[in-house]
Amino acid sequence: MKALVENLKATARETDATDIRAAFAADPNRFSRFSTALDDLLFDYSKCAVNDRIIDGLEALAKAAKVEEKRDAMFRGDIINITEERAVLHTALRNRSNRPVLVDGKNVVPDVNAVLEAMGRFADHVRSGDLKGATGKKITDVVNIGIGGSDLGPVMATLALAPFHDGPRLHFVSNVDGAHIADTLKLLDAETSLFIVASKTFTTIETMTNAATARAFIAGKLGEAAVGHHFAAVSTALDKVGAFGINAARVFGFWDWVGGRYSIWSAIGLPLMIAIGKENFGRFLDGGHSMDEHFRAAPLRQNIPVLLGLIGFYNRNVLGYPSRAILPYDQRLTRFPAYLQQLDMESNGKGVTLESQPVEFSTGPVVWGEPGTNGQHAFYQLIHQGTDIIPAEFMIAAKGHEKDLRHQHQLLIANCLAQSEALMKGRTLAEAKAQLTSKGMDEAKADKIAPHRVFTGNRPSLTIVYDQLDPFALGRLIALYEHRVFVEGALFNINSFDQWGVELGKELATGLLPVVEGRESAEGHDSSTTGLVAALLKAAR
């Protein structure tokens, strides 16, 4: 692998691969040669710093890393999460073909379908008004209490699919900061509110702290006997859920082969199903399944998740770019960059190989972004003229949902395409000076100002286009990026499905709580932590 990467570096230098502007000038068919499609989903990577020899080298890299074999092992249900000794089968949750999927010799598809049907019945009862609160009033507000994968996925998808909401209002509480739950409770009528507590173990400290506050809210307003009428849970810890006061009929489980950041397809997606209905949730699953089938069957050079992963690895380890910007030109995808941030950085932010050795490559990049056009008036300055090159990933729908605002969607499209073109083409010093003098500026001043208006160009980007953001399109888009993360993890030779980096801080926080509460001494902690605790305790008096 190391030799193949070094060969790619040499090829990039020899072929001037990073001169994207020259590549377009030399090849009028570059777009058609470096783009591919799955139905209405178009993937354009022609503005990336690639050429035929680079793609050849990346394909060889994929074969050397056994990407296809590792992919097949995942779909087969092999134990690929080696540190936790688990299969990785979020794909089984959206297996619309009902093709058997075996875990320890058992076909899990019937169990998946049974949970999906139970979710559908419950969602229907909430949406229709048949499920009522303790005082007989129908539910108007649903609050999901979770964190990490139990929050980001439902939040992101619920916002993204707002045009399909025909159920009760949705709210999401994640942060242990009491302000989050307090601000949410102010919006609610206890009699018409339903809380969904999403925690597989029912022990997640942030989630259970917020759940206890919500429980006290219901009990305080309606009495202790009302609690069971206003709560449901997504968990496998039936004993703890029962002790909390939630009836087993309102508990929806999922499996240890579903990681939190991949769990939107599971019962964690219950709030989304309540918002958009089980038929639309089914279309969401259909979209994910369609990308799964493409990922499984398409040749490497037409395989969109594989190409996306190879380009990501190439940008990181051949060209040395440390981050990537996720730029959806869709306001309803406002949380999609944050969702991908968790998906990518929690999966591939690792430093140890599958053989328990230090990795030989730079692993996951920093993933960040905001919707366009907002970002254009914030951080695009750095992307265009900063000293670091940041590959950009644009996404845009051909059609918006607001038919009477078609002119605004056209303006949105124009901005999206203009940004990718500007990143590639840039503006030379001569062009900048000519523009200034054409507006009447004298030569001396133009010579001074023009360097500030130079854009180097040759800044890589890719663009994903789809017809319209609907449940199918969103499911397909999420699955595309899930598989991209898988491909990059296979190239890094790491386990993309554990998250031990989350644990140390949690352990230390548990030990620090009695210190912060003033019940124990800070002795034994470093001087910075000791000093900070003292300052905070003094200020809080």
Swiss-Prot record:
SUPFAM superfamilies: SIS domain. It is an enzyme of class 5 (isomerase). GO terms for biological process: gluconeogenesis; glucose 6-phosphate metabolic process; glycolytic process. The active site is at residues 346, 377, 506. Its main location: cytoplasm. GO terms for cellular component: cytosol. InterPro entries: G6P_Isomerase (IPR001672), G6P_Isomerase_C (IPR023096), Phosphoglucose_isomerase_CS (IPR018189), SIS_dom_sf (IPR046348), SIS_PGI_1 (IPR035476), SIS_PGI_2 (IPR035482). It is found in: Cytoplasm. Pathway: Carbohydrate biosynthesis; gluconeogenesis; Carbohydrate degradation; glycolysis; D-glyceraldehyde 3-phosphate and glycerone phosphate from D-glucose: step 2/4. It catalyses: alpha-D-glucose 6-phosphate = beta-D-fructose 6-phosphate. This is Glucose-6-phosphate isomerase. It comes from Sinorhizobium medicae (strain WSM419) (Ensifer medicae). The lineage of its organism: Bacteria, Pseudomonadati, Pseudomonadota, Alphaproteobacteria, Hyphomicrobiales.
